[in-house]
Amino acid sequence: MRKTAVPVNAPTLLPMEMKRRTIASLMPHPVNGGQAEDFTIITSAQRGYPGFPGRVGRTREESEPHWESPVRARQGAPNIVIVFMDDMGWADVGCYGSEIATPNIDALAARGIRFSHYTTHPICSPARAALLTGRNAHSVATGWLAQNNPGFPGYFGDIPLDAPTIAETLRAAGYATIAVGKWHNSTDGVRPNPTWPTYRGFDRFYGFLEGETGYFFPARILYNNIVAPIDAYPEGYYATDDWMEKAIGFLTEIRNHDPTRPFFLYVANNAVHGPLQAKEADLAKYVGHYDAGWDAVRAARFQRQMAMGLVPAGTRLAERDPAVPAWDEVPADQQRLFARHMETYAAMLDCADQNLGRLVALLDELGELANTIFVFSSDNGGTNSAGPAGALHFSRRYAALPGLPVELDLEREAWVGTGRGSAVYPTGWAQVSNTPFPSYKTYTGGGGRRVSFIVSWPDKLADCGAIRSQFAHVIDVMPTLLDLADVPVLAESHGKPAKPMQGKSLASVLRDAEAPAPRHEQYYECWANRAYYRDGWVAVSLQKRGEAIDFDNWTLHAHAEDFSESMDLRRQHPQKLAELVEAFDEAAWANMVYPLDNRTPARRFLEGPPHLRPAAESRRRFLPNAQTVHRNVIAPLIANRNFTIVARFRHGAGDRGVLLAIGDVAGGLVLYIENGALRLTYNGFGRFHALAGPAVPEGECSAALEYEALGRRRGRGRLALEGGEVGEWGELSPTLMGGFHEGLDIGLDRRAPVDWELWERHGIFRYRGTIRDVVIESGPFAPDMSFARE
């Protein structure tokens, strides 16, 4: 009941009189000889308008309105664009010594500043978390790949809400915020949750949440928080083009609504991460360009770097990796295959450069190019993950399988660079990407942690085309941009005090070539590989996958005399090494780096919280007419275990099409009806099998695939119709276990096809009849639940 104030010593009033007198108290009413009675006016808050700073009466005339002013950025605030590449080495763009045509990136450097000693966390998710938060990756729970939570604080995989992102900070300052492309900072890609981009400060997001996807057939694109309803991509579709097309569309939308509002655009290209796939027109530019081989191309890049002044005089080119054969020792047929891999890589980077040119042209046309801060960089260096021969079917690694023989890749050479393969280039080309440094992605040597870094702001940075040799790290990007844009750091985030930023602004270095580096030390850790940099010295410890961690195998390098980190000085300076090793240990404890984990890819990639693992025996029913069921839901139901999949449907005369499909070109299975009969194609990550089933009668039907996991990744299956013929057992090896991007489709095979030939005949091959449901019944795991690759 609402309480009403009454005057002191007032007579007792009946309810109606109380109401009358209360109303009267709100208006001038001389009583008692002209003196106003001591009534207390009820405030807006007491009437149910808490926090409203205006006044509310019973009528408009008695009230005072109030309008909240929207947050506006300061007048003249710059636009901010970050173009982030994926798995691109220090030496891959033209302005860092490459032969690849990157005129738009080179122009960015010509009107900006290049850094020669910028470093990163050497793997995807940690580098992105550090970039977006200005904090060390482990300290924001992202010391490893986001989708592989091992259960320790530095590795949970989701950026905590008390670590505000640059998007959240800029939006609070009045910026429009946009992200396109790759996210890879959420553990849960299935359901909308507070780790998705639009929950972490972005007004608009168009892209994918996971670590990689195909370029011709991306899996599960999100438009903000909604799965884009894409069954098939149009002819000529290519993801890198699509990301920029949407970015330009978002920017145009912003300008149509508000011509002056500054924007922050995060272009997170998945190029040049595998699978290496490129458009034919771009591939054609590079045919024959890499026939000279990786030794010659690497030497030429090194010479250009020296001539540019990026690499100091007297620097040694790091020795060739012992795992990389000399090019002239590679058989001629393999040379052609290996060159094709690098042609594809170059074409992909060329395409990304073209799209940067489209963005620059738009900003130039709008008259906003001069007042736009551009940052261009990569998450980490080039990768050696595919080994000396590369891999056409690299997804086998994610499925805990050994690579296929190079002879098979030779037979399928025409697939390299197309949507049919999931290729990654050979280690020799990764060493070219990382010229002049040794080491690769996931390792803390120079090749993994040192990447190109360009900052451009024509309106304010006068030293165009210059090179800065001051040390910098990825966590410095956010504070630098906030400093340049004069945007304050957030004190609170999602109702909590914000974690302090660990990055330092590089603004002084950008404005003055002689300014000291604001940062003089930094730790690095990835997959138990460690490094520590301090005042020109760096200690590095690299590990062998799956072996006991060696805590004493550190090497020591002096940056002033050894830019390429190719000379080990640990014996000459044992005290300096001990100092850096101790500093790493202190930083590791302070940033939640421990425990170190050096398990194999199979063990790490396939681990997850126990509550996400289905029971040993489980049954799931799935309904048609819905979006693709996420692979994280489907894969555990069939991973290296017995299972039965049953599709119930009504079949009419002449009906045909896909009943269900799991997976994509990388691996999976598709059950379909063609020429009146039940058929199955099984894509065992480059090993293909087919089962022919019985003819399908008209009427209500129930078709089943029965699968047995036999151990050592072998399996067999058979097709059956309820009440009808049961097919013969046929080999379906290897067992499926991750490695594909798509989940379960019912009634069609969306986007990337499991069976390429079937797709060429029929496209997505939508079933013409009526499907009731699909049931997956999981059985026991394989007898040994072994990993073929340890």
Role assignments for model-derived ranges:
Residues 17-18, 44, 57, 610, ...:
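Intrinsically disordered, low-complexity regions enriched in serine, threonine, proline
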Residues 22-550, 554, 563-582, 596, ...:
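Formylglycine-dependent sulfatase
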Residues 560-564, 724-726:
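Asp-box/BNR beta-propeller loop motif
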Residues 581-599:
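Charge-dense polyanion-binding interfaces
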